[in-house]
């Protein structure tokens, strides 16, 4: 049964420091439960209400800075994983907002994302506070930006955009549909301590990917493993028009149990969005699972310094370790796309 937790979109007071009570953002939804459908309330009115509540906290100058026309295709695609100092973003910077304004924006994120997705994003965001600014580069939660493209509406399309170093969420809302693609899902450091607990924002995703690799036979690994060292992202910022690269092992070559494991891996991304939209999202992916490929570059160990990619008609996922700044396994770049629905192409007409 699909469930939607009750969430009040306004009047929410949220802590501005991510807690570290869990070691990873969430346990992925089992594939056997992920695509069961039932009637649930439309999420869009709550997202619109929360966004309008956020706008009501802003000054006239701030509203002008944060709002862009729906026809502004440049702003829709203006995002990067680079830190402040290497990339110029537009909108409102988090560090310049009041506490009331911050809490109002967090309510927008919380109603758009699932509880688990919100936790993952907050953990990735908080990781940036572990990095030291210097050399003209600035790191930390204060250097994340908010932009609104179009007018918040329950009927006509619009987009909210939030991001900074290693994390970007592009949320396109059109009627009852919410699309979170493309989004940059990374972390540096990939493991850190908060309130005495170890936090691994992407730990469950790595575990799911390695479990899938480990389940493959020698013959299957010959198809899936494409190289002995990790590679960089193919579908990162600025690669919106790049055609999908289908390589690795196809879903059609997997056993039923392995297909379940592949769906479990994918659910770590598909479940970023609220429960209502996540169920439909997983159904789309499951319908084309036989044409969805899993590829691996790097050591076949659990060390975390390997790249993997999931590529299908409805999903592109990349996980790419980076050597810059220390151990590759502790610096992750990641992407989540839908080749048919990036920036809501399939739902905005």
Regions found by a protein language model. Give the residues of each.
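Secretory targeting and sorting signals
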Residues: 1-28
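A cross-kingdom marker for long, charged
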Residues: 23-349
């Amino acid at each position: 049964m699909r469930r939607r937790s009750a969430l009040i979109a306004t009047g929410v007071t949220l802590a501005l420091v991510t807690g570290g009570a869990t070691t990873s953002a969430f346990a992925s939804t089992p594939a056997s439960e992920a695509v069961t459908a039932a009637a649930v309330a439309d999420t869009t009115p709550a997202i619109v209400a929360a966004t309008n509540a956020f706008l009501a906290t802003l000054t006239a100058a701030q509203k002008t800075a944060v709002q862009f026309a729906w026809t502004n295709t440049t702003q829709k695609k203006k995002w990067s994983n680079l830190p402040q100092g290497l990339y110029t973003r537009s909108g409102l910077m988090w560090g310049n907002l009041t506490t009331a304004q911050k809490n109002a924006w967090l309510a927008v994120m919380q109603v758009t994302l699932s509880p688990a997705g919100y936790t993952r994003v907050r953990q990735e965001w908080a990781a940036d506070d572990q990095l030291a600014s210097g050399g003209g580069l600035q790191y930390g939660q204060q250097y994340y930006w908010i932009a609104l493209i179009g007018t918040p509406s329950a009927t006509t399309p619009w987009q909210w955009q939030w991001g900074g170093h290693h994390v970007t969420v592009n949320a396109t809302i059109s009627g009852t549909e919410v699309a979170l693609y493309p989004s940059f899902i990374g972390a540096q450091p990939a493991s850190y301590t908060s309130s005495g607990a170890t936090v691994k924002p992407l730990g469950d995703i790595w575990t799911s990917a390695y479990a899938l690799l480990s389940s493959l036979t020698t013959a299957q690994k010959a198809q899936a493993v494409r190289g002995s060292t990790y590679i960089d992202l193919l579908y990162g910022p600025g690669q919106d028009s790049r055609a999908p690269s289908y390589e690795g092992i196809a879903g059609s070559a997997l056993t039923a149990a392995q297909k379940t494991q592949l769906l479990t891996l994918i659910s770590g991304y598909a479940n970023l969005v609220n429960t209502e939209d996540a169920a439909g999202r997983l159904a789309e992916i499951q319908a084309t699972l036989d044409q969805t490929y899993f590829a691996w570059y790097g050591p076949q160990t659990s060390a975390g310094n390997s790249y993997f990619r999931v590529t299908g008609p409805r999903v592109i996922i990349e996980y790419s370790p980076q050597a810059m700044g220390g151990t590759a396994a502790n610096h992750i770049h990641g992407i989540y796309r839908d080749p048919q629905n990036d920036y809501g192409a399939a739902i905005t007409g």
